[in-house]
A protein has these predicted regions:
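Selective transmembrane helix interface/packing segments
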Residues: 1-228
Length: 228
């Protein structure tokens, strides 16, 4: 049990990789460095996939990319509704980032989503976007008025909901990623080594992708709710 606690504390700890020598030294944590690696990998992949595109004679690579883009566009269009289509690029970016961040543990890196600061930042960005979407769709006056709907007595609850939504998104993503680690450690204690290895692949691949889907799906629903 002590080994489990020690392992959990180690997973929660985010090491400082280096410091930028300004303002007394700005610490750059492991989750930030891994995020930079993910950003660089996605940029290079987009650069590679975006080369030599043709309208008249599309190659197999272009057809595959267009199919993927169409799939994401159709999926998010159903979730967001007509008024929320402007936010598809954001949701597509987030699901790609979270998906890769959860899978990067297979390469020996510590997933950034195990750092609560990362999940909190993603949640705050999403909630800011949701409220901005509501203001754009309804106008400032109608947006403010919506807090008193369907009746003025629930105004405090609607205001509190603004802070509950990011907390829910943050803790759901962080909790599920951390929960998979706890389950894996418990499996290692009670079953042979080969069984945890199989479940490790499940949690790293399927559960990681599911959590990315759940995060953007809920964000999409919140955007649709805000814009209607």
């Amino acid at each position: 049990m002590y080994a489990l606690v020690d392992g959990l504390l180690e997973e929660l700890n985010c090491d400082v990789v280096f410091k930028i020598p300004i303002f007394g030294g700005i610490p750059i944590y492991e989750s930030v460095v891994v995020t930079w690696i993910i950003m660089a990998a996605v940029f290079l992949l987009c650069f590679f996939l975006g080369r030599n595109l043709s309208v008249e004679n599309p190659g197999r690579r272009q057809v595959a990319v267009e199919a993927g883009v169409k799939f994401l566009n159709d999926f998010f269009s159903e979730t967001l509704g007509e008024k929320g289509k402007d936010y598809i690029p954001y949701l597509a970016t987030v699901i790609i980032y979270i998906g890769i961040a959860n899978l990067i543990g297979l390469l020996g890196f510590k997933p950034p989503t195990k750092d609560m600061n990362v999940t909190a930042a993603l949640a705050v960005m999403s909630i800011v976007l949701i409220e901005v979407a509501g203001i754009r769709a309804k106008g400032t006056k109608r947006w403010l008025k919506s807090f008193a709907e369907p009746m003025p007595v629930i105004l405090p609850i609607n205001i509190l909901e603004i802070f509950i939504k990011p907390l829910s998104l943050c803790m759901r993503l962080f909790g599920n990623v951390l929960g998979s680690f706890v389950i894996m450690e418990l499996l290692k204690m009670v079953v042979p080594a080969i069984v945890p290895a199989v479940f490790s692949c499940y949690f790293d691949i399927f559960d990681g992708l599911i959590q990315a889907y759940v995060f953007v799906f809920l964000t999409g629903l919140f955007i649709k709710e805000a814009t209607e």
